[in-house]
Amino acid sequence: MDLRHLIQDVPDFPKPGILFRDISPLLRDPDGWDEVMRQLGDLCTELKPDLIVGIESRGFIVGTALATNRKIGFVPVRKPGKLPGDVLGIDYSLEYGSDRLEIHADALQGHPRVLLVDDLLATGGTARATVELIEKAGGDLVGCGFVIELAALGGRQQLPVEIPVKSLIIYS
């Protein structure tokens, strides 16, 4: 099933010159969403993760649905100050500034096999930082899954070459 027709292009959002790829129509379409879960579920069958890690915020939507579907746990990676208790964090650079991501310090104890999921792979900065955070927390990253990849922005090249990356929709 081709999922592209369920992605809405929103020009000039969140600022002029940006073409935002909105997954909201995909989320509303039960057949389309089922196809997302099937394809990412196939990735889980292949890679056998113990946990799904999702990046705030749309990665939570994809990740919790997939984790529930596969009957495995979910771990959120959040913006700073959103998780109670002890956390591990990583600072990373953006095109125009910097940001920080955090994970519970004990979330990946025991070196679980981790699949990282998010709605979008663009420049790869956030995904790369999350990969580093997973490793810092003790997880064994076995793969990455994305609903959309903006290939022209080179995000895939920011991820470890030995890690399988699956994107369901690729825009060149």
Curated annotation (Swiss-Prot):
GO molecular function list: adenine binding; adenine phosphoribosyltransferase activity; AMP binding
Which Gene3D superfamilies does this entry report, sorted A to Z?
3.40.50.2020
Give the source species. Answer: Prochlorococcus marinus (strain MIT 9313)
Q: What's the name of its gene? A: apt
Q: Name the Pfam families on file.
A: Pribosyltran (PF00156)
> By its UniProt entry, which SUPFAM superfamilies does this protein fall under?
PRTase-like
Functional pathway: Purine metabolism; AMP biosynthesis via salvage pathway; AMP from adenine: step 1/1
What family, per the record? Belongs to the purine/pyrimidine phosphoribosyltransferase family.
Query: Any idea what this protein is called?
Result: Adenine phosphoribosyltransferase
The organism's lineage is: Bacteria, Bacillati, Cyanobacteriota, Cyanophyceae, Synechococcales
The entry's keywords: Cytoplasm, Glycosyltransferase, Purine salvage, Transferase
